[in-house]
Amino acid sequence: MFGLSKMLRVGEGRAVKRLKKIADDVIALEADYTDLTDEELKAKTHEFQERIAQGESVDDLLLEAFAVAREASWRVLGQKHYPVQIMGGAALHFGNVAEMRTGEGKTLTCVLPAYLNALEGKGVHVVTVNDYLAKRDAEWMGRVHRWLGLNVGVILANMQPAERREAYNADITYGTNNELGFDYLRDNMVRSLDELVQRGHHYAIVDEVDSILIDEARTPLIISGPVDGSSQWYSVFAQIVPRMTRDIHYEVDNRKRTVGVREEGVAFVEDQLGIDNLYAPEHSQLVSYLNNAIKAKELFNRDKDYIVRNGEVLIVDDFTGRVLDGRRYNEGMHQAIEAKENVEIKNENQTLATITLQNYFRLYDKLSGMTGTAETEASELHQIYKLDVIPIPTNRPNQREDMTDLVYKTQEAKFAAVVDDISERVTKGQPVLVGTTSVERSEYLSQLLQRRGIKHSVLNAKFHEQEAQIVAKAGLPGAVTVATNMAGRGTDIVLGGNADIIADINLRERGLNPVDTPEEYEAAWDAELARVKEKGAELAEKVREAGGLYVLGTERHESRRIDNQLRGRAGRQGDPGTTRFYLSMRDDLMVRFVGQTMENMMNRLNVPDDVPIEAKMVTNSIKSAQTSVENQNFEMRKNVLKYDEVMNEQRKVIYTERREILESADIAADIQKMIDDTIGAYVDAATATGYVEDWDLETLWNALESLYGPSFSAQELIDGDSYGESGELSASDLRKAVLEDAHKQYAELEENVTAIGGEAQMRNIERMVILPVIDTKWREHLYEMDYLKEGIGLRAMAQRDPLVEYQKEGGDMFNAMKDAVKEETVRQLFLLRKQFAVANEQPAETEEGTVEA
């Protein structure tokens, strides 16, 4: 993996030179556009669109379009792209990952490729990590695009389909990876073209690409529906397990995140439930409830792995610290946690549709991304997404100082030292950003700071709505911001305060915003921004004199990249800054990987709790542990992809066929083929061997009766004049006769429907029958594939490759599912014919009865 990383970096020099040449050429065009009036500059958009219509490519227009968007950004936002931002924009346009340091202006960089590619009229998707950033960027950068005559849309949670459709039809659409992925799945569940919201996957720019394509790649997007008969056993075991004792009744492996019930535990549970054998067949489901209840107690911690808000258990992303809205643990785990927290236990769900982010983003014709920390994942981005990482130079030299880690014996001593350090920094007017790994730790530190009377803001999954306001002011003199990993993304910490965001907040407080009141907002913008900048410049100078932003990490993350993201908050745009990590021997990563060795050494040396050590051995051990976890996670993601590749190929077949049915005006030929295939398979199976005397025609006719209802019996066919004496009927004759009969009956159905509603009505009926059948069979297939995957690992014990077995059996199951779709569709359509026949007979009976009366 790391050898490939080195190889990928070899060609970076040439790529950077090429991008620098593009930036120089764009800047050389500046004079051509600065003299244009606003109307003349806006008219360039239509000119570019006309040139594309006449055969020019977006590559041909790159220099001019970038120059126009750059000038428009200056006129609208008061911000002009630096050469390095133009380089980043070009890297994105060519389908790469632009690695740009924190504070280098990735959001403004994105304006250039988004504008250029939107000129094609096929749609550009700008993907962010949360709704707030999607809305902010759509409003903020959308000001430039709208000024240039393009439409900008945003996809937010809880939007109605009509609103989503309008947003996707815009030239540029902002949204989160989850919303885009779920809309794709929902689009492949609709019953008519009018219900579709997306219009294709042309070009995507993924902000924080490492977070979305790497960190979240292990978790598939799942649309699920409730399963009937939710169990009360979750509550029962939520009362039993707290009375059980770890290492007596059960054991826990924190590293593997598994639990095992001991004999003492089994006996205890049997006694509590009043049963003789927990593992008896009739109690087999109880073991799963027990294991989940133990996991909920030992492995899933409130305010770390999840939070409880308004009576609902919400998952917290381990990497970003943000709430994963709409996500639920599967296999009953979420219900076990709900029972533990004594909130409403929601029904278990069955998967209706699913896709991994890896496979969703591979749908795009062109994909690109931005991040400040992609170097450690360059090989994975290349292997899975065919994305090359290009490091973009900083606009100014980096002056950040990264200090050595300090390691304490206990967490209490560590946090006491952290508070002392913060107090010292605040006294001299230096702003401090404190990074924590969980909601629980951030609130614990907040309590310590309150006791010391240190004013501070807390930014975690519970308060994510205030993220922009808190981060915008995190660079003010003496400001203290305690945050989970979420503060590492999306909004710059600017020394002296983020003038753009503070000005925007001030205008919104006056009732102005760029969407609802664009003219009034733009008219007030320049003066408000100038006022905030003037005040901010004075404060920024004070902060620089105090040493710039101080970033303090309270624990190492298992990913080096997350640590680097936190460090990257300091020293933006050439500002001074300092970073340091405070660790303890009881930190999760230290416990899991460094073990007792270091703690024993500290004890032998009689190191007091409040005295830290700075040892190269610790640093190396941490680096080794992080590398080990990264490799492990990479292998897990590759494994997920290998198995999902099987499902992905099947998904593409089903979704393609489904879309063709939706879009086709006439699927009569498809239905006729289904009748041929299904009935033909029935007959072929019954006549595979021997002669008429050997065929089980009774079973065949029962099956045909269930399927469509033949108008003649098997004996009538054998005795019929057309086939001569008994015993002379061939398999092909039988096949032909039954198919002719079926098609004749189907033609009668078509005549009846057409007489009432026209031919279009018949085609609609066929469509309305086949789509639910596909959805039902696909849903059942997903369940069966999940079941297959759960147990496939055991094949390794028989010296068989689980993946190969999964591919083979999954393929067989998929073919069986396709046959089942045909069979059920034919059955449903002929059932409709029978209903028509009954309906046609009923009026005659009624009429006759009336005459008799």
Swiss-Prot record:
It is found in: Cell membrane; Cytoplasm. It is an enzyme of class 7 (translocase). This is Protein translocase subunit SecA 1. Part of the Sec protein translocase complex. Interacts with the SecYEG preprotein conducting channel. Has a central role in coupling the hydrolysis of ATP to the transfer of proteins into and across the cell membrane, serving as an ATP-driven molecular motor driving the stepwise translocation of polypeptide chains across the membrane. SMART domains: SecA_DEAD (SM00957), SecA_PP_bind (SM00958). CDD domains: DEXDc_SecA, SF2_C_secA. It comes from Corynebacterium diphtheriae (strain ATCC 700971 / NCTC 13129 / Biotype gravis). The keyword Membrane applies. It catalyses: ATP + H2O + cellular proteinSide 1 = ADP + phosphate + cellular proteinSide 2. Disulfide bonds: none annotated. GO terms for molecular function: ATP binding; protein-exporting ATPase activity. GO terms for cellular component: cell envelope Sec protein transport complex; cytosol; plasma membrane. Monomer and homodimer. Part of the essential Sec protein translocation apparatus which comprises SecA, SecYEG and auxiliary proteins SecDF. Other proteins may also be involved. It is a peripheral membrane protein. GO terms for biological process: intracellular protein transmembrane transport; protein import; protein targeting; protein transport by the Sec complex. Keywords: ATP-binding, Cell membrane, Cytoplasm, Membrane, Nucleotide-binding, Protein transport, Translocase, Translocation, Transport. ATP binds at residues 85, 103-107, 492. Its EC number is 7.4.2.8. NCBIfam families: PRK12904.1, secA. HAMAP family: SecA. PROSITE patterns: SECA, SECA_MOTOR_DEAD.
